[in-house]
Amino acid sequence: MLKTSFLLSKRNAVSLSRVLATGISGRNVRHLTLQPSEHYDVAIVGGGIVGLATARELILRHPKLTFCVLEKEKELSMHQSGHNSGVIHCGIYYTPGSLKAKLCVQGLDLTYQYCDEHNIPYKKCGKLIVAVEDKEIPLLNNLYERGKKNGVKDLTMVDKRGIKEIEPHCEGMFAIVSPNTGIVDWAQVALAYGDDFRKGGGDIFTGYEVTDFKCASESGKSQEKEAGLTHPVTVFSNNKQTIKCRYVITCGGLYSDRLAEKSGCNREPRIVPFRGDYLVLKPEKCHLVKGNIYPVPDPNFPFLGVHFTPRMDGSVWLGPNAVLAFAREGYNLLDINLRDLADALAFRGLRQLMFKYFSFGVGEYYRGLNHAAQVKQLQKYIPSVTADDVVSGPSGVRAQALDRDGNLVDDFVFDGGVGEIGSRVLHVRNAPSPAATSSLAIARMVADKAAERFTL
């Protein structure tokens, strides 16, 4: 595993030393020192899968330029990239013509190709989207047509008998079969991106929480103005360290709106954290599930619904629910950050969403606290699953972008900035699922936008 960390230097209490493993295996550790005047052509903020994929793509395209990745945690992929279902999505759900649809379909092929080239294990276990009620059949048909419009490969429709041939324990009336949907450890993929970036000459700094961006001309310090002739942007950290660069790209995930605001962007769309709690099938019951089993999405509700997800380690995750997290990194019910919570509740868009889906939200909280209630939803698809067959599993936090009217922003969003720094910053504002599947395709788009916006 690629691990990086900052340590205080014995020679200088304000300088930081980076420990960077040169490969995923963790061998061949070398030590570098981050100087207060470190200079780069481009700094990428965010060491998750989108940030690392973007850094990799940029250094492949521009090997003569200097790049660094700045990550606030002690390790890479600590949040959404390391807390997800592990599904390689096919692209069936998304609005035809949207970036989500386009980049997911591209990303699926790129992901399998990348994993093959880098010997990263995956399983192409497929997915069933199952209609269990008459009213879901028209929705299933519409979803099938949407997948075709999006260019999703090899989709078929099967009846009850066909469902049983694929998933013997699953009940349903009709189902869409997506044979190319798969599973992978996305954290492992992200670390491989980071390793590619490092091998290309890039630097990765962890423990570097970005607190502000400024152009040299915005500062009263003549030294910064002089440095600004070639590297006008200063990136400040909570450790009082600075990095100077020509351009900045942010892939901040749960903090993307706050990072964008630092360059003068509108805070909207606002990021609101939603926690998803999973159950896990006991090992002796994992034979009940062979591949991914998903419900037909209900257009009356904002989230996908509970599903069955096999994992690379042989376990099976069930869920998740979707509830407001009380902290942007709130993986447990009692994780509370007063700033995050006040920020969310003060936002008109969240209040609108809560009002519109109040009963849905109450049900989600209840199912998160009551295994039997969650299992009851799952029994629609596999009736033989009981509450005794499951245990509490992990949780993840989703960075959901909302507009001020309470609508979920359903597509990827890119933004710049205003003022002197505006032309030197590019923000990935909204990159929810299927961002992991789409990561290599997103990286290509970000690199294209950077080439247009910046002088690289």
Curated annotation (Swiss-Prot):
Signal peptide positions are none
**Cross-referenced InterPro entries, in alphabetical order?**
FAD-dep_OxRdtase, FAD/NAD-bd_sf
* Transit peptide region: 1-20
**Cofactor(s) needed by this chain:** FAD
| Highest taxon above the source species | Eukaryota
Q: Name the enzyme's class.
A: oxidoreductase
What reactions does this protein catalyze? (S)-2-hydroxyglutarate + A = 2-oxoglutarate + AH2
> Any idea of its EC number?
1.1.99.2
- Recite the UniProt keywords alphabetically: FAD, Flavoprotein, Mitochondrion, Oxidoreductase, Transit peptide
Under the heading Pfam families, the entry gives:
DAO (PF01266)
Q: What is its main location?
A: mitochondrion
Q: Where in the cell is it found?
A: Mitochondrion
Q: Which GO terms describe its cellular component?
A: mitochondrion
Q: Give a GO molecular function annotation for the protein.
A: 2-hydroxyglutarate dehydrogenase activity
NCBIfam families assigned to the protein according to its UniProt record, in alphabetical order: PRK11728.1 (NF008726)
**Assigned protein family:** Belongs to the L2HGDH family.
Protein name listed in UniProt: L-2-hydroxyglutarate dehydrogenase, mitochondrial
Q: What is the native source organism of this protein?
A: Nematostella vectensis
